[in-house]
Every structure is written in structure tokens, then in C-alpha cells.
Regions:
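Conserved N-proximal alpha/beta basic substrate-recognition cap immediately N-terminal to
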Residues: 20-143, 163
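Catalytic micro-motifs at enzyme active sites that drive phosphoryl/nucleotidyl and oxygen chemistry
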Residues: 102, 111, 143-146, 157, ...
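Glycine-rich phosphate-binding loop of ATP-grasp-fold ATP-dependent ligases
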Residues: 122, 130-131, 154-178
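Short catalytic/ligand-binding loop motif for oxyanion handling, primarily in non-cytosolic enzymes
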Residues: 130-135, 164-167, 221, 235, ...
Length: 352
């Protein structure tokens, strides 16, 4: 057998192993959530479970995609056609629609160059041990420190290739010296966003983050397809995926649902720490934030789906905390406000 054929077979085997690991990981996550949901909502009926398996097999190409469909059904109370499972999104949609270029969104030091937006709260960057101002001009270490704290007592540092709040550091002037700068990885320094007053009652110790998901349509236009508000806990200095509370947003009005979801997807009607109800809260500047994200996505048509983490400041202006086209999970929005991605043809991508 030729060496090229052997390499091809080895690559195919490695891809199969990778896919099976992905399925197994998603199945474990989905099964944990389903068990939690069934504690509060009762067991998911056999007919619904059968619908999920049949739909996964017949429409999405494999019954292995059924676990997330069961979770969505448990949240919704019935099965709905058109849902996209989390592992199908990761294994099929992302490679087809975002490709390798989606990884660029995880390089935070590159974001401003790509988006060219004043909505980014970037102050400076650290790249290969060298400091750069927001316009990518080189600055010395002492000048960089002065620049970072020219207007703020504390700033945020986010390493490249980090997501879900991992690796974030909150730094004061006393925390940074030329020596400590030399030990930091590549990353972006951002100024803190003073959130709109309406969020202070919900999460006073961390900045509430609006997760907006935009998708490219078959005609090339871009639409907002999902939205929810992410809130930190009392002990969190920033919103963390492991502890956050998520509240769906009605996209037509920008109004919060009356119920939010804990990390185990148990539903609550108010923030567990502050006691503030979610009812009748309208996100300030919601439609302007959505329009901005759609406009920026339109200018970056290489990507089929983008998750945007947005903070709303005191003036109702949207600030881009992160964008993600590589690890932007869709399972929460699918379970709560979905199906969010109908009429895009995603359910047929596996046939390519």
C-alpha cells in the first residue's frame, strides 16, 4: 500500500476517534442536564424521546445527535422540528460555515484589526512580549503601564485563545511592572465598562453581558437569531460560564423573560443573590446593539454564525467584550427560544 494511502487511512481513523469523543462529551453534558431537568419537571416521556431519536437519525444523519434534542424537549415541554444539537453544530455546522477562519475570533489581539470598531474597549495589546497601543503602534513597557491606567484604576487582561471567562485577570497599577508584563501571554488589555444602571440591581459586582447570536442567510444577509442576558453571582468579579445565570430575551422587544436559568438549568424568577425579579425588564439599547452586530457580521461574510458578548454602558451604547465563531455554543438558545436557525439549510449540511 502506498504511503499516501496509509496516511489517508490514519487521518480518517483519527477523525473518527475525534468525532466519537465529541459525541461522548456532548452526550455526558446533555444527560447531566436532562437528569437535572427531570428532577424538577418530571421524566421525559417515551414518545418524545422516540421523536428525538428518529429526527436525529432521519434528518441529521445519526441517532447520536439525540441527547441534546431530548434536553431541548425537556425544557420546551414537547419536541419541535428544526432544532440543532450542540454536537451537530460543532461537528458539522462550524466546519462548513465558519471553517478554519473561525479560529481568528479567539485571537483577541487581532479583533480590532478585523472588526475596525470603536465599540471595542481595547486599551492596548501584548504580542510576543511587545506592548502595542490600540492603534498597534509600539510602546515601551513603562509607557504601556502609564497608558493602561491613564483613565482607570483597574483594567482587564484577556489572553488570546481564551473564552467563557477563562484566564481573565483584573489588574491594578500595583499588579503590573515591566517584569510582570514579560511573564504575561499574548492578550488584550481592556478598560472596564460601567454598565447601565438597570443592571446594577441584577448583578452589582460584575458586568451583565448580552449574548447575541447572528447568522448569515442563504442570500448573504445577516440576522439576529438568538439573545440572552448573562449575569454573574455575588462572588464573581466578572461573568463566568460555570456560575452564570442566563435569562432569555424576546428579540422583538428586547424584554427579558420572567424566568432565568441556573447553571443546571433550574428555572428561577429572580436573581438568587440580589432577589431582583427578571419580569418587565427591557434591555436598554438592545435593538441598536443587535443592529451593530449584524452590521459587523455583514462586513465579515466569511463566517456563517457568530456569538457576540455585549455590555451596555450608562449611555446605552454597546461595547463588544468578545466575539466567537469557534466555541459559540448554541444549546441554551435552542432549548429556550429555539429553533433559532430554521431556513438556513443547516440540517442538510451533513450530506455534503
Amino acid at each position: 500500500m502506498a504511503a499516501s494511502a496509509i496516511k489517508r487511512l490514519v487521518k480518517q481513523a483519527a477523525l473518527r476517534v475525534q468525532r466519537e469523543r465529541c459525541h461522548a462529551q456532548h452526550a455526558r453534558m446533555a444527560q447531566r442536564l436532562l437528569a437535572s431537568l427531570e428532577q424538577y419537571n418530571g421524566a421525559l416521556g417515551s414518545p418524545i424521546q422516540r421523536q428525538a431519536r428518529d429526527y436525529a437519525h432521519e434528518v441529521l444523519g445519526s441517532a447520536k445527535y439525540a441527547p441534546w434534542l431530548k434536553v431541548y424537549s425537556a425544557v420546551h415541554g414537547s419536541f419541535v422540528e428544526g432544532w440543532i444539537p450542540g454536537d451537530y453544530y460543532q461537528l458539522v455546522v462550524l466546519p462548513c460555515k465558519n471553517g478554519q477562519i473561525g479560529q481568528a475570533t479567539n485571537t483577541k489581539t487581532l479583533t480590532k484589526r478585523l472588526l475596525n470598531s470603536a465599540a471595542l474597549p481595547d486599551i492596548a495589546y501584548l504580542i510576543d512580549g511587545i506592548g502595542y497601543a490600540a492603534d498597534y503602534s509600539v510602546v515601551s513597557a513603562p509607557a504601556l503601564i502609564d497608558l493602561l491606567f491613564a483613565a482607570d484604576e483597574r483594567i482587564f487582561f484577556k489572553p488570546d485563545r481564551s473564552f467563557q471567562g477563562q484566564g481573565i485577570r483584573i489588574l491594578g497599577r500595583g499588579d503590573i511592572s515591566p517584569e510582570t508584563l514579560a511573564r504575561l501571554p499574548d492578550g488584550v488589555f481592556q478598560r472596564p465598562v460601567i454598565q447601565h444602571q438597570i443592571f446594577d440591581a441584577l448583578t452589582p459586582n460584575s458586568t451583565a453581558t448580552l449574548r447575541l447570536t447572528t447568522a448569515k442567510l442563504p442570500d448573504g444577509s445577516v440576522e439576529l437569531r438568538a439573545a440572552d442576558l448573562r449575569l454573574g453571582r455575588a462572588n464573581d468579579r466578572y461573568v463566568r460560564a460555570v456560575s452564570e445565570i442566563r435569562v432569555p430575551v424576546e428579540m422583538a422587544t428586547g424584554v427579558l423573560w420572567s424566568r432565568g436559568f441556573m447553571p443546571d438549568w433550574r428555572q428561577v424568577e429572580s436573581h438568587p443573590d440580589t432577589g431582583t425579579s427578571f419580569s418587565n425588564i427591557q434591555i436598554p439599547g438592545f435593538h441598536q446593539a443587535a443592529a451593530m452586530c449584524c452590521r459587523l457580521h455583514q462586513g465579515f461574510p466569511h463566517l456563517g454564525c457568530i456569538g457576540w458578548d455585549i455590555a451596555i454602558d450608562r449611555k446605552e451604547d454597546a461595547k463588544i467584550m468578545e466575539w466567537n465563531a469557534r466555541h459559540n455554543s448554541i444549546v441554551f438558545s435552542e432549548a429556550t427560544t429555539g429553533p433559532s436557525f430554521k431556513w438556513l439549510g443547516w440540517e442538510s449540511l451533513w450530506k455534503r
